[in-house]
Amino acid sequence: RRNSGSSLVSSSSASSNLSHLEEDSWILWGRIVNEWDDVRKKKEKQVKELVRKGIPHHFRAIVWQLLCNAQSMTIKDQYSELLKMTSPCEKLIRRDIARTYPEHNFFKEKDSLGQEVLFNVMKAYSLVDREVGYCQGSAFIVGLLLMQMPEEEAFCVFVKLMQDYRLRELFKPSMAEL
């Protein structure tokens, strides 16, 4: 005979343990973010391990920016100026926007905020890196960033990924790295 009372207790206990783990994770990641300069230098291995285990959604945007040092970029100040310029890639970017995460609520509606900010970031990048310009596949990276952070921050992280982490090699017109 099954004791339904004990299964309720164990379920409740498991739920309580999970919420404590989540709370501990929030406290830990909050401390990491607040003490980033010290933590980055003194506990690099532990940070790598924690990142591999997963960054809580609430901290993802700031941690991704910290990990790639995007906040130190002067390019962020140029972003609004880049948006005022014309890119030779604009027509191509507009054509492809609807193909980027077409089922995701943020991007699926024509001329939605999601499509607008995706266009903005892709256009700005095409002006910063004229050799790469625009490549449709890169919009999926930017789209993922935009799901986590505002467009200026997404732009800075994308520039860092492309330049410092050599993703731009994958998107050069020759695509030699593929």
PLM regions: where:
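N-terminal transition regions in large eukaryotic proteins
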Residues: 1-126, 146, 168
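Structured all-alpha helical bundle cores of eukaryotic regulatory proteins
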Residues: 80, 85, 128, 139-178
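Solvent-exposed, flexible loop/coil residues
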Residues: 101, 110, 136-138, 174-175
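Hydrophobic (often cysteine-bearing) scaffold residues that line and stabilize catalytic clefts
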Residues: 114, 118, 138, 154
